[in-house]
Amino acid sequence: MENVPNVYFNPVFIEPTFKHSLLSVYKHRLIVLFEVFVVFILIYVFFRSELNMFFMHKRKIPDPIDRLRRANLACEDDKLMIYGLPWITTQTSALSINSKPIVYKDCAKLLRSINGSQPVSLNDVLRR
């Protein structure tokens, strides 16, 4: 046999000598600040109304039923009457959905079943 020379491979590690300067934050502070500024502008443009609603004081909307809380119901014969409405000084007939007066046999008995012997306010009926 012929004499074959042996070749041995040794791993060689080469340490990189260049630096990644593009990844450095310190060199590009202005770019980062510009990006943050652009993000805030975009948030303002697209979410302006939501931000305004979040920071504005919420106005309390008055409940229209609050004006009816002092009104009371009473019976005149078999007719249901409302008195104490703020815009009407006299006793008025209670109206149904079709704008006809509410007439119910044993009207007083019905009102007693709602609130006993105490006067029945419109608020008592609306809460049920």
Swiss-Prot record:
Keywords: Disulfide bond, Fusion of virus membrane with host cell membrane, Fusion of virus membrane with host membrane, Late protein, Membrane, Signal-anchor, Transmembrane, Transmembrane helix, Viral envelope protein, Viral penetration into host cytoplasm, Virion, Virus entry into host cell. Signal peptide: none annotated. Most cysteines are linked by disulfide bonds. They are created by the viral disulfide bond formation pathway, a poxvirus-specific redox pathway that operates on the cytoplasmic side of the MV membranes. Unglycosylated because produced in viral factories instead of the classic ER -Golgi route. Residues 52-107 are virion surface. Disulfide bonds join 75-107. Residues 1-30 are intravirion. Belongs to the orthopoxvirus OPG099 family. This is Entry-fusion complex protein OPG094. It comes from Variola virus (isolate Human/India/Ind3/1967) (VARV).
